[in-house]
Amino acid sequence: MHERLKELRIERNFKLKEVAEKLNVTIRTISRYEDGTREPSVEMIIKFCKLYDVSADCLLGLTDSY
């Protein structure tokens, strides 16, 4: 999932700082989600899905369709 998080952020032209502000977490937290050293909670996964306008299946890498 961590690769997908970074891929979606870059595709949507968001900077780490923007995502962190929108999700009310630190830049370091987003960075750790993206590099795989930390796993997001279910609540955070839902927030990512809403922010990036994708399904949970897409975010989790179960499907490629947005």
In which residue ranges do the predicted regions lie?
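Residues in the helix-turn-helix
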Residues: 29, 39, 58
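Short, charged recognition helix plus adjacent turn
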Residues: 11, 60-66
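Short alpha-helical DNA-recognition segment
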Residues: 14-32
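Alpha-helical residues within the helix-turn-helix
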Residues: 10, 21, 50
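DNA major-groove recognition helix of helix-turn-helix
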Residues: 34, 52, 63
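A short, Lys/Arg-rich alpha-helix, primarily the initiator
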Residues: 1-11
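DNA major-groove recognition helix of helix-turn-helix/homeodomain DNA-binding modules
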Residues: 24, 43-58
